[in-house]
């Protein structure tokens, strides 16, 4: 259950958040919202640790940010948020990721943007294999499965954030073809 910090009431995780109608692709319950907030907060903290570590020359922060980025990429590897060509049909799905990773212009946008920035700040501290893990299982997968659409059809958020996220991810992946996308 979740306790609201404002009204102090306790809510079951499956309670409809009431933000979007059930027919909206962003519709979700309170559990979805809390998990999405976790992803957004974690990736933001990774960027902050990496940036502060660089600015202050603090290897502890750089090491921790690298560790978290690699852990995140490893977890993303086995996380089926959309049916994909690479996923076995019998692979279990986690109910929350159906709506969390449809937040194209909100949650994913921020998550991918932060992952790409963190990767840029930490790339030189990783082995070739570690870089490949982050590139393939975190950045490229979110980009392919969630962000790429031929036409932006949503009115929930600003299109510039969608574009800047694709460009940031393209820079992290060193893909000039995506910058001109």
Identify what each model region corresponds to:
Residues 1-56, 62:
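N-terminal carbohydrate-binding/catalytic regions of secreted carbohydrate-active enzymes
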């Amino acid at each position: 259950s979740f306790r609201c910090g404002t009204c102090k009431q306790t809510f079951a995780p499956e309670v409809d958040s009431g933000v979007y109608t059930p027919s909206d692709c962003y519709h979700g319950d309170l559990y979805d919202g809390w998990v999405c907030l976790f992803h957004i907060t974690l990736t933001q903290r990774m960027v902050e640790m990496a940036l502060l570590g660089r600015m202050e020359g603090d290897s502890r922060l750089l090491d921790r940010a690298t560790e978290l980025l690699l852990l995140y990429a490893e977890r993303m590897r086995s996380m089926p948020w959309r049916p994909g060509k690479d996923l076995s049909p019998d692979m279990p799905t986690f109910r929350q990721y159906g709506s969390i990773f449809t937040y194209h212009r909100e949650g994913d946008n921020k998550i991918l943007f932060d992952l790409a920035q963190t990767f840029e700040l930490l790339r030189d501290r990783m082995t070739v294999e570690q870089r490949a893990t982050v590139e393939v299982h975190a950045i490229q997968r979110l980009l392919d499965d969630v962000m790429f659409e031929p036409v932006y059809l949503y009115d929930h958020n600003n299109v510039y954030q969608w574009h800047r996220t694709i460009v940031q991810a393209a820079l992290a992946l060193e893909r000039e073809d995506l910058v001109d996308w």
